């Protein structure tokens, strides 16, 4: 049992360890899908190219499967241009975005020669991002859901619809929520260090939710707003830098 899609980032500080684990795993490189992300002070035409080279050096790998711009802060348009060049050079297999929507997404789409393949955003039954999905569908861009189970929020996990469906399908509430994501066409990143929960996260492909059940879950969307004011969040992100030396 184990994951073959690994999601890391420069700001997480674990790229060296991730690269080492991949090399020691004995698993062929083409059977592992590796995503990393660049931080705002690595964004800019000419700057991002160097950041990509440093990333590959930290990982000690020849390429990553997917590189994302972590947040819409800094010169992300210039970063995108460098990322497109890196695709042509074989350093990146694909490129995408993280936490982009509205005008920030439009900025990229206006200049993109290579369209983003994913946008990684907070997404769960209380934050379903319906408008964003409509925009991404136009360019065949997938949603990757971080915090897919709503950060373990007790109110969400005790919603009657989930308890009811859990009994019906003999599944846990997180399994019901993850199955909802799959039915919606989302790529999910359920975070857990518990072997039991990791195993449970895989056991969601032996049942399906009905259209009516999916619609009931969809109607939960306006109950809570998890994410702090987005512009304030971006100001906080802008106050943090990663090293440009390693």
For the regions a protein language model found, what residue spans apply to each?
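Short, well-ordered amphipathic alpha-helices
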Residues: 16-23, 52-56, 83, 105
């Amino acid at each position: 049992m184990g994951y073959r899609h690994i999601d890391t980032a420069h700001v997480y500080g674990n790229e060296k360890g991730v690269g080492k684990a991949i090399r020691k795993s004995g698993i062929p490189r083409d059977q592992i899908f590796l995503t990393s992300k660049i931080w705002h002070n690595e964004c800019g035409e000419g700057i991002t190219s160097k950041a990509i080279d440093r990333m590959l050096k930290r990982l000690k790998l020849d390429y990553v499967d997917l590189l994302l711009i972590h947040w819409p802060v800094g010169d992300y348009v210039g970063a995108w241009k460098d990322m497109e060049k890196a695709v042509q050079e074989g350093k990146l297999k694909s490129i995408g975005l993280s936490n982009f929507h509205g005008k920030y997404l439009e900025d990229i789409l206006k200049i993109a020669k290579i369209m983003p393949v994913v946008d990684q955003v907070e997404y769960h039954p209380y934050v379903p991002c319906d408008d964003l999905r409509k925009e991404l569908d136009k360019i065949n861009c997938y949603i990757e859901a971080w915090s897919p189970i709503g950060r373990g929020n007790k109110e969400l996990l005790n919603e009657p619809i989930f308890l009811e469906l859990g009994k019906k399908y003999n599944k846990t509430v997180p399994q019901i929520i993850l199955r909802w994501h799959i039915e919606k066409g989302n790529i999910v990143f359920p975070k857990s260090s518990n072997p039991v929960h990791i195993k449970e996260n895989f056991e969601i492909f032996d049942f399906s939710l009905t259209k009516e059940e999916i619609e009931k879950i969809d109607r939960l969307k306006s109950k809570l707003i998890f994410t702090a004011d987005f512009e304030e969040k971006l100001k906080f992100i802008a106050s943090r830098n990663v090293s440009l030396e390693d």
